[in-house]
């Protein structure tokens, strides 16, 4: 007998009989799994059986389970591509197939599923997970993956590693899942009779949080916390501190835990190289985060339950999270070929100074990654980006390779944008398949991805999508959001009161999609109306049904010709099939594009008046309160954001396939957003109506600093991006010159000097600002999202916690589950509200009341945003599509690229 067959037979015989599914062989060869994977994915993914999953304490007893320090992977055998070292399971990449063909999901060389490769067949050398020596918890997790996405794990082993990293073991029972505790009770609706006794009990339990005390403290916070915050918003910070204390006994406070094999190799080397200095830096960071951090209850839930991970059975500490982020970014800067130039622009001589600079920006909340990237950066086999824009023409057939690519991306928690009207498949079937799988992912993962479905409104398939949204609301997919690509010809016909609008089949609509210029599109559209088969609809009815879908809260509007007309592309380009899922980033290429978000916290540029000499500087804007806004600090933050973004792009391209590097090198896009704009205005004592000039100045300085930093990188010796000659920058133009010429606050001599340097040296990047929502990042730092106004002084947000029972016997689908809602406090209002019961001193206005002011401010700032601005529209329950249609026409005349990001009931 072959020795390999003998080992396989021994592993099969060691599997307990009660763990084997009836009618299925416990363990099969890799070749058999590969041949049957494409046939089993649909059944295992969509129709998996959850009846065999069992829950209960670990065999080690209640004491071991409640302690919460059992190694998750201590019993995993070292077989079939998985190696066990130091109690940590790590996936080792298999050798390529004999014929040298890459696998369908061999996305990266050194990291997890980044961007799927274009083609090829499934490799036959995929590793399998052997549960022979695993513990009961690990066996449960293996069976859960068989029900949840076993076939995808067989095709893409990095997803298996992603599961091991993203999962957590609860501290109360030892269950393997996504939360640190089980059983969230229904929040109390009334205050307790003796609030002082409740606070004393919380304080007593927090002092003895080891063992089951942390679970008791968690129950008290979840039970009475929301009601206490509604009654007294000031107790939000105290509840956030108690929420952190519930995790103190199980936190890993040593930075040496990041030398684990779960972390990226560059991070491990950096930690081992600086193992003498990092403990002191970690201690200072933990003390700063604990004392200076403004952590309310909702921010604490985001930090501990979305950002922090478990390593070797212990949770990350908040200070350790920021240290890991800083180490990962520093390693990306140092491992780049241009590290010396990056250090020069960061004003750092060696990597220790780079680490201190990056750590200061991260822990202060001045520059922030997305919450998803904050939770995954620095780890091995995980995505290094936030979103994926699917624009690959090879995916038009919507074949198994394309569906597997999108599902693999969703399995890793990354949101995807897909244009279904340009696929050679039934649009409703694709929506059901991707939406159903996305809902399964959202049930299992803390980071809930979405599928943004884009629909071309000149394709006849748009009628089917609209009917699907309106008629199948009972089985609505929670993970699917829609976006309608509205052409200019449709808006012009509605304005001219023309009643006939034509929709074409897929070949004609694709031919129209290749015409990005508005005049060429209208000319070809008129010709096709005369010579091609078409479906004629009423213009008013068609638009009203489209906006009725938008009023359901799951559809956005994109003026697709404005996206091309007011873009940085000088040559004629095709109409982009889709934007990013957050409706902020544009992509004009024909390859899948990963998006890396980076947010600048504008509220961190507001300071108290202490230095009288600095108040007379030209970059200082005095407020009505004892505060001022410093534009020079804002430019410094944007400059560092450009350096960070280029280093992250270098790291992503070095770990990806050649065609991903080629796609990113064309424009080297930086997706820089903002947060805390309304918070900054309230702290300065300004209303939104009186701040239009200040908002325009803020974005002018951001755009100037971004272009200046990109030019300086080329001036230092870096090559310009490949498509620089195809952009308006080659002609010496700036993005605001495509609109009306605004009143610039920066001296014209500085703009002309920048123009001359740009023509001489070029640009390292050609896309800079993308104003997305970034709401989770904003709530993490206690500021308002993006350029949006605050919804109220105290408002509620959904958390990752669910109120349904967690056990399998009481399983509820996603549409029945009720998420726990926690009040969020507007701290800019709370700072000025000195005593309870007195009128507030700051000028606060809720978002629905100043919606028109926010829209006008967006018109002014959009001239400096080279990508898109995502807005929120608040509507009343009695609003009709006619009213929304009139507002949509106004958005079109204001030259918005994205009419609205999402709709919210006021």
Curated annotation (Swiss-Prot):
Which SUPFAM superfamilies does the entry mention?
PFL-like glycyl radical enzymes
The organism's place on the tree of life at top rank: Viruses
What the protein does comes down to: Does not possess a ribonucleotide reductase activity. Betaherpesviruses probably use another strategy to expand the dNTP pool in a quiescent host cell.
Disordered as annotated region, ranges:
1-70, 89-129
Q: Which organism is it from?
A: Human cytomegalovirus (strain Merlin)
What Gene Ontology molecular function terms does this protein carry?
A: ATP binding; ribonucleoside-diphosphate reductase activity, thioredoxin disulfide as acceptor
Mainly localized where?
virion
DNA repair as a keyword? no
Question: By which gene is this protein encoded?
Answer: RIR1
Query: In what ranges is there compositional bias, type Polar residues?
Result: 98-109
Compartments where found: Virion; Host cytoplasm
What processes in GO biological process is this protein linked to? deoxyribonucleotide biosynthetic process
**GO CC list:** host cell cytoplasm; viral tegument
- Keyword tags: Host cytoplasm, Late protein, Virion
Q: Which family does it belong to?
A: Belongs to the ribonucleoside diphosphate reductase large chain family.
Full protein name: Ribonucleoside-diphosphate reductase large subunit-like protein
């Amino acid at each position: 007998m072959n020795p390999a067959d003998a080992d396989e037979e021994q592993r099969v015989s060691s599997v307990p009989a009660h763990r084997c599914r009836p009618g299925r062989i416990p363990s099969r060869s890799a070749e058999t799994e590969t041949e049957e994977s494409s046939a089993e994915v649909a059944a295992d993914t969509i129709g998996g059986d959850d009846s065999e999953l069992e829950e209960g304490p670990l065999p080690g007893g209640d004491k071991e389970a409640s302690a919460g320090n059992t190694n998750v992977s201590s019993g995993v055998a070292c077989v079939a591509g998985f190696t066990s070292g130091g109690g940590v399971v790590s996936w080792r990449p298999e050798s390529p197939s004999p014929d040298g063909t890459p696998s369908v999901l061999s996305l990266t060389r050194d990291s997890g599923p980044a961007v799927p490769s274009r083609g090829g067949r499934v490799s036959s050398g995929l590793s399998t997970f052997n549960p022979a020596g695993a513990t009961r918890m690990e066996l449960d997790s293996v069976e859960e993956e068989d029900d949840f996405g076993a076939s995808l794990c067989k095709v893409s082993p990095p997803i298996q590693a992603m599961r091991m990293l993203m999962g957590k073991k609860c501290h109360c029972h030892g269950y393997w899942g996504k939360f640190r505790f089980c059983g969230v009770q229904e929040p109390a609706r009334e205050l307790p009779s003796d609030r002082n006794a409740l606070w004393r009990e919380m304080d007593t339990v927090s002092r003895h949080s080891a063992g089951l005390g942390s679970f008791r403290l968690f129950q008290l916070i979840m039970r009475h916390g929301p009601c206490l915050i509604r009654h007294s918003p000031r107790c939000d910070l105290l509840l956030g501190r108690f929420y952190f204390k519930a995790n103190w006994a199980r936190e890993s406070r040593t930075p040496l835990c990041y030398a684990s094999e779960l972390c990226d190799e560059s991070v491990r080397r950096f930690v081992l190289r600086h193992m003498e200095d990092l403990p002191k830096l970690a201690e200072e960071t933990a003390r700063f985060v604990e004392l200076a951090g403004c952590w309310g209850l909702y921010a604490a839930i985001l930090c501990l339950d979305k950002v922090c991970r478990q390593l070797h059975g212990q949770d990350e500490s908040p200070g350790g999270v920021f240290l890991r982020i800083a180490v990962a970014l520093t390693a990306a800067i140092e491992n780049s070929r241009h590290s010396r130039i990056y250090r020069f622009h960061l004003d750092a001589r060696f990597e220790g100074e780079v680490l201190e600079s990056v750590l200061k920006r991260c822990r202060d909340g001045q520059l922030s990654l997305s919450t998803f990237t904050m939770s995954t950066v620095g780890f091995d086999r995980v995505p290094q980006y936030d979103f994926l824009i699917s624009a690959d023409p090879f995916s038009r057939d919507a074949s198994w390779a394309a569906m597997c690519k999108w599902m693999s991306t969703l399995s890793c928690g990354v949101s995807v944008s897909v244009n279904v009207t340009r696929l050679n498949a039934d649009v409703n079937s694709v929506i059901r398949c991707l939406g159903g799988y996305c809902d399964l992912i959202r049930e299992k993962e803390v980071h809930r991805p979405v599928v943004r479905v884009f629909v071309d409104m000149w394709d006849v398939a748009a009628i089917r999508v609209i009917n699907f949204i309106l008629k199948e609301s009972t089985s609505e997919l929670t993970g699917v959001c829609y976006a309608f690509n509205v052409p200019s010809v449709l808006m012009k016909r509605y304005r001219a009161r023309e009643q006939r609008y034509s929709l074409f089949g897929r070949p004609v609509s694709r031919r129209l999609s290749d015409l990005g210029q508005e005049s060429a599109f209208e000319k070809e559209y008129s010709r096709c109306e005369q010579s091609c088969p078409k479906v004629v609809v009423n213009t008013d009815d068609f638009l009203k049904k489209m906006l009725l879908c938008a009023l359901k809260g799951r559809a956005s509007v994109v003026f697709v010709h404005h996206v091309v007309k007011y873009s940085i592309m000088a040559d004629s380009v095709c109409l982009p099939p889709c934007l990013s899922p957050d409706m902020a980033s544009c992509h004009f290429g024909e390859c899948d594009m990963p998006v890396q978000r980076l947010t600048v916290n504008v509220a961190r540029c507001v300071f108290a008046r202490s230095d009288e000499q600095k108040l007379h500087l030209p970059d200082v804007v005095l407020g009505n309160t004892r505060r001022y806004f410093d534009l020079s600090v804002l430019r410094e933050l944007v400059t560092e954001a450009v350096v960070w973004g280029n280093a992250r792009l270098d790291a992503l391209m070095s770990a990806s396939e050649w065609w991903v590097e080629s796609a990113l090198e064309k424009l080297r896009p930086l997706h820089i957003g903002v947060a805390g704009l309304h918070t900054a205005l309230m702290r300065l004592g300004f209303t939104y109506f009186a701040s239009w000039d200040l908002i325009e100045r803020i974005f002018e300085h951001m755009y100037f600093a971004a272009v200046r930093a990109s030019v300086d990188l080329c001036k230092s010796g870096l090559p310009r991006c490949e498509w620089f000659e195809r952009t308006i920058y080659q002609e010496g133009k700036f993005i605001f010159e495509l609109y009306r010429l605004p009143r610039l606050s920066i001296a014209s001599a500085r703009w002309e000097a920048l123009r001359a340097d740009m023509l001489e040296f070029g640009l390292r990047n050609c896309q800079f600002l993308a104003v997305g929502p970034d709401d989770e990042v904003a709530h993490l730092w206690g500021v308002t999202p993006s350029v949006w106004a605050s919804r109220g002084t105290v408002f509620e947000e959904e958390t990752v916690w669910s109120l349904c029972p967690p056990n399998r016997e009481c399983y509820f689908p996603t549409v029945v589950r009720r998420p726990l809602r926690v009040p969020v406090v507007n701290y800019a209002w709370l700072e000025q509200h000195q005593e309870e019961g007195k009128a507030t001193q700051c000028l606060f206005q809720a978002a629905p009341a100043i919606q028109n002011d926010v829209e006008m401010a967006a018109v002014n700032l959009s001239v400096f945003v080279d990508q898109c601005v995502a807005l929120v529209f608040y509507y009343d329950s009695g609003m009709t599509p006619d009213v929304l249609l009139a507002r949509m026409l106004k958005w079109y005349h204001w030259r918005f690229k994205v009419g609205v990001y999402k709709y919210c009931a006021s």
